[in-house]
From Swiss-Prot:
Tissue-specific expression: Preferentially expressed in flattened chondrocytes of developing chick limb cartilage. Also found in the cartilage peripheral zone bordering with bone marrow cavity.
One Pfam family this sequence matches: LRRNT
Organism: Gallus gallus (Chicken)
Gene: EPYC
Gene Ontology biological process: articular cartilage development; bone development
Function comment: May have a role in bone formation and also in establishing the ordered structure of cartilage through matrix organization.
Cystine bridges: 112-124, 273-306
LRR repeats: 138-159, 162-183, 186-207, 232-252, 253-274, 284-304
Record-given protein name: Epiphycan
Taxonomy, superkingdom: Eukaryota
Mod. after translation: The O-linked glycosaminoglycan chain(s) are dermatan sulfate.
Cellular compartments annotated: Secreted, Extracellular space, Extracellular matrix
Glycosylation sites: 98, 296
């Protein structure tokens, strides 16, 4: 009996399994990677279905949403590439411009392209310039050495209220306007050596250093009391000129006076000291150079009594 039952159950299970419909499964194929989802074959679509249009509509609306969740990814967003930062030239003619590139030379070039501008310093050395170029208003230090500048005009340094140093070494300067430097409120150092200057103009009282060596200054080249009101002056260099006297009076602040290689022939006892005040000591003036002049310093010993050091020069 048990054998009959087992045979019956086995036959029933075999028939049930054979009755289950076999369906094709959809597997991922790289060929369909670039095909739109709407073109993929759907397992439930029958070629013999009379309502194919309706089925295609349902496939295009409902089914792809499921497939998209499995295979599609969020669209890639390209991050904007950072452009390389390039220094921009500021047009000083605009309201926001700093004025650095506004001044132009006679050739029509901005000064800071012809010369070298580093911060508030302008270097125009050895540029074959025949005139002082227009300078940015914030210029503090100006160097124009080894050029061909012949004349300093009244307005060459006009409105440069921050200018502290001017160096015009080794040019061909023979003429300087009387007011070329006088109105510079912060000028500290003026270097005019190795030129052809015959007359020293009026100078601002703020100067601490003056170098007019190797020029053509004679008896009338420096006016009387030219340095009297320069109360901050510390260094005065007038070597290699044609002076026949020491320019007086000299400010009390003076520390170094170089007058080598001139034509100074005499020295007064009150040139450096106060003959009526034997207690007077001129402590600041420690460096006096008179060598290269036709003068015998030993003839005027009382002229140096107030000095901390004797001048350098001929004693015979």
């Amino acid at each position: 009996m048990k054998t009959f039952v087992n045979i019956f159950l086995g036959f029933f299970i075999f028939e049930s399994v054979g009755a289950v419909p076999i369906t094709d499964t959809v597997t991922y194929d790289s060929e369909f990677y670039d095909v739109s989802l709407g073109e993929l074959p759907h397992p439930f679509v029958s070629a013999e279905n009379d309502q194919s249009d309706q089925v295609e509509t349902e496939i295009g609306t409902a089914i792809p949403s499921i497939i998209q969740e499995s295979y599609s990814s969020a669209p890639l967003t390209e991050e904007p590439e950072e452009e390389a930062s390039t220094p921009k030239l500021i047009d000083g003619s605009s309201a926001q411009g700093s004025g650095v590139l506004v001044p132009q030379t006679q050739d029509g070039l901005p000064t800071c392209l012809l010369c070298t501008c580093l911060g508030t310093t302008v270097y125009c050395d050895d540029r074959e310039l025949d005139a002082v170029p227009p300078l940015p208003k914030n210029t503090m230090y100006f160097y124009s050495r080894y050029n061909r500048i012949r004349k300093i005009n009244k307005n060459d340094f006009a409105n440069l209220n921050n200018l502290k140093r001017i160096d015009l070494t080794a040019n061909l300067i023979s003429e300087i306007h009387e007011d070329a430097f006088r109105r510079l409120p912060q000028l500290l150092e003026l270097v005019l050596r190795d030129n052809r200057i015959r007359q020293l103009p009026e100078l601002p009282s703020t100067l601490t250093l003056i170098d007019i060596s190797n020029n053509r200054l004679g008896r009338k080249g420096i006016r009387n009391e030219a340095f009297k009101d320069l109360h901050e002056l510390q260094h005065l260099y007038i070597t290699d000129n044609n002076l026949d006297h020491v320019p007086l009076p000299l400010p009390e602040s003076l520390q170094a006076l170089h007058l080598q290689n001139n034509n100074i022939q005499e020295m007064h006892e009150d040139t450096f000291c106060k003959m009526r005040d034997f207690s007077y000591v001129r402590r600041a003036l420690e460096d006096i150079r008179l060598d290269g002049n036709p003068i015998n310093l030993s003839k005027t010993p009382y002229a140096y009594m107030c000095l901390p050091r004797l001048p350098v020069g001929n004693l015979i």
